From Swiss-Prot:
It comes from Dictyostelium discoideum. This is UPF0512 protein O. Belongs to the UPF0512 family.
Amino acid sequence: MTLFNSISSISNSTGLYKQSLIANVDGMTISSSGNSSSWLSGFDGCGGCGGFGGCGGGFGGCGGSNLNIINVDMNIGRRHRRCC
């Protein structure tokens, strides 16, 4: 849930949709729907059917990490900062 809140705060500040942000990271096309919690449920590990990687697979597979999402989070944060 922490990851979901992080992405939500990024999308609120930059005007991006959560669905398009995650689609860019994974390189897949995701249809935008109201029940975003259903495909966000498989992020951190062994997600069931309806997870990001399909039946039995989470975002990075079973026990995978979220380094790609964290990289996007950090890159977006750096892009909008102004140098002193």
